[in-house]
């Protein structure tokens, strides 16, 4: 290849680079527009909540006996308020959220918001797969520790627990930022478990550890099995939530979702309660070990307290969450309806953008078509209503 051919190739590359610069300028403009629309949405959500609080406060005067006509209107307003809260929550899922203090300490001031619904589902799915893989590894290592009494194998397993729970706390904090409704106790549970694993890691080899060792390994084998059952339950929930919004002919209704959720939960609860009982048994065993044999290291009493704390927290939270879910079925129904509509709307917008690309390919350049599609996607709910 001679120098003239290379020169011509460079000139062609320059033309392509000019197109790239033009595309990048449009991209930057759209990013600025996106930020502007996000601020508008934040302000409108704040305004909606302020007005709703005023209406809710005014409704309190109708708590006493009211005429039948007014009672029906009051009930309708209460239902519409619940529905609007669910709608606002769903809108917030498409907007960036601030990281919590824990993430700011661990990762710094980094934006971890996932704005695309499918990406959120994918991240949640990846989180569940991560737990499954690590639980299988933990199950295998705990099983080997039951067969072989090697200190190096014990330390490797306990170090795995420390790393696993540390990673879970970070991933769950990211999920929380992105709208996950995980209860505060379950996050605290993993922080406490991290501390417990750290105490186990520095627990010196001795008579007290050898007495408790086998019981602890059996406990981990059982917990790994329960985690596998939980993985199946969570995967089923994710699939059905996805089906609510992504299927044109939905293969599951909201009533069907609730029915499956309660069946799965009723199957899982006995295994969970047995696990909680095992935690209480561990706490009692360690409490006795703290006094006999004598000269027990401080790790014994600390681990006894941590297992007791985990038992009380898990039992109380589970017994509180199940009745709460029953009481809030109406609110949950509105949330699922809003989620389903939002996911279907996003899919329709995506399909419309694809149809536009095909139909106007001869009239618009690829860059212009992309600009149109992104501009449509960044419209606020108010703008979409006006159009």
UniProtKB/Swiss-Prot annotation:
Q: Where are the transmembrane segments?
A: 130-150, 155-175, 191-211, 216-238, 264-284, 302-322
Give the residues annotated as coiled coil.
1-39
Q: Which Pfam families match?
A: TMEM120A-B (PF07851)
Sugar attachment sites = 111
- Which named protein is this? Transmembrane protein 120 homolog
**Family listed:** Belongs to the TMEM120 family.
- Which residues are annotated as modified residue Phosphoserine in the UniProt record? 352, 354, 365
Keyword Signal in annotation: no
Sequence ranges of Low complexity compositional bias? 352-381
Does the keyword field hold Ligase?
no
How does this chain sit within the bilayer?
Answer: Multi-pass membrane protein
What keywords are assigned to this protein?
A: Coiled coil, Glycoprotein, Membrane, Phosphoprotein, Transmembrane, Transmembrane helix
What does UniProt give as the signal peptide span? none
Could you name the Gene Ontology cellular component terms for this entry? Answer: membrane
Chief location category: membrane
**Species whose genome carries this gene:** Drosophila melanogaster (Fruit fly)
GO-annotated biological processes: defense response to Gram-negative bacterium; positive regulation of innate immune response
In this chain, the stretch annotated as Disordered covers: 346-387
Name its cellular compartments: Membrane
